[in-house]
Amino acid sequence: LPAMATNGYWSYGYGPKSKSIAGACVAMSFGAMCAASNPASLVRVGNRIEAGASLFAPTRGFTANDDAQTPPYASIPPGEYKSANDLFLLPHFASNYMLDEQSSIGVAIGANGGMNTEYDSAVFARFSPPGVPEYQASAPVGVDLKQMFVGISYSRLLSEEHSIGITPILAVQSISVTGLEPFRMFSKYPDSVTNNGTDVSVGGGVRFGWLWRVNQQLKLGASYQTRLWMQKFDSYKGLFAEAGDFDIPPNFDLGFSYRFTPEWTFAFDYQRIQYSEVNAVGNPADLVFIPGSTLLGTDDGLGFGWNDQNVYKFGVQWQYSDDLTLRAGYSY
């Protein structure tokens, strides 16, 4: 039973086998869901169908201290704030079909999500200017972002040692934002900041993979996913930088696996997620809100302030018997 976490808003792995070794599977070949990490592995897993789901129970909240400056400076009322909605279902499905001894085609479906927030009180009530109804903060306050990916993979053996793979990816994402009315006054598009229901965008990109079986013990792997170019969130173009642009950032993985004995295998992956490539995520989050300024919805507008993320994944697998495999992993 894996302990669940995320790398930013990315899942650290897709499918139970991947999650159980903290996602360190770019150089592993143990299932069709490995296509989410490295499509080059599929030609080595044979015909198979996999389906399942994970229950994700993150704890989300924050504490507002009582040392904020007094008005006219806005502040959040001091206290403990805990988000509602503690349990999320993340399904997955994957299949692989061998076209011949040298090639295969597969389908994989995965998702990111489960880190939404929903606070029951009007958290930003003190940010509202008096006497302006359209800027009065409401409750609940929160953001709900969901992403789903469908990949169709082709994998081919170039030799006994080398295989490659390519996965065109269809991505669908949705977002809903509530309770941010006071921030309309700082937006280029004040009617497209908050409380506009659920907006959906569709887009896609490509993942490439390579796997090298150096010998019976050592395998090396690498994969690269392009930026996923998405339609803009038009309903929230006044909130996100570049008028609602929320592309999914590119990332790459490098890794190896080493089979010490027929029973024991160790795996390591290095992943880099390039959040700074997407302005809505990478733009600074520490801009000063001055009356009359326009900080939201512009190309240089407020972002999450996230840097590119380096992720290190370690996994170990023990094939105890033909019927039992034990795995453990750590992602940092």
Regions found by a protein language model. Give the residues of each.
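Transmembrane beta-strand segments of Gram-negative outer membrane beta-barrel proteins
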Residues: W10-C25, V43-G61
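Outer-membrane beta-barrel pore proteins
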Residues: V26-M28, A35-N47, S95-L99, L158
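Short hydrophobic/aromatic segments of transmembrane alpha-helices and their interfaces
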Residues: A24-C25, G31-A32, L145-K146, S201
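Surface-exposed strand-loop-strand hairpins of Gram-negative outer-membrane beta-barrel proteins
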Residues: G23-F30, T59-D86
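Outer-membrane beta-barrel porins/channels
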Residues: M4-K19, Q69-Y73, L87-Y332
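Generic detector of contiguous secondary-structure segments
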Residues: M33-L42, G151, V311-K313
